[in-house]
Amino acid sequence: MRTQEVLCPTDFSATATHALKYAVEMANLYQVDIRLLHVVSPARSAHFYGVAVETPAALEQKLAQFVDEKMQSLQQEMQLGLKPGLNIKCIVRHGDASEEILAEAADVGMVVLASHGSSGLADFLKPHVSQDVVRLAKCPVLVVK
């Protein structure tokens, strides 16, 4: 692998969580760290994240808190399966999921992602994030069903 990391994008869906197990296996096999990525899409509503708010500022704060808690939980769960000395770096980006994943994938050795994620408006607008990543990434991509 080109660098010391496996990129694992997540949208917190069951399929994405299943893909995390494969990312841990790859990291252990190649003795590399994991970069866990979540992209907050502008097309996703507070309802998708299960957050009720009164103002845009409150929405931003609640979403950030929700995403941070989910990422920390996934990081702790994944760390249990990693060999000693390997680490997980959590990254949250804002924007189009395909674009942000591809930007993050520019300097990793491999991407491990789910074949499909959560359903909602974002998927209706751009349903094939995994296809975009497979087609455009410069590194190997493992797509997990």
Spans of features found by a protein language model:
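Structural beta-alpha unit
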Residues: M1, Q76-V111
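Intrinsically disordered or low-complexity boundary/linker segments at protein termini
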Residues: M1-H18, G81-G85, K89, R135-K145
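Small/aliphatic-rich secondary-structure junction motif
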Residues: R2-E54, E104
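Histidine-centered beta-alpha loop that forms part of the nucleotide-sugar donor binding/catalytic region
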Residues: D11, G95, S115-S118
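Active-site phosphate/pyrophosphate- and oxyanion-stabilizing loops and adjacent acidic/basic residues
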Residues: V24, Q76, Q131
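Conserved beta-strand termini and adjacent loop/short-helix elements that scaffold enzyme active sites
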Residues: L37-V39, I91-G95, V144
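A short acidic, glycine-rich active-site loop
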Residues: E54-K70
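Gly/Ser-rich helix-loop-strand patches that form or flank binding pockets
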Residues: E104-K145
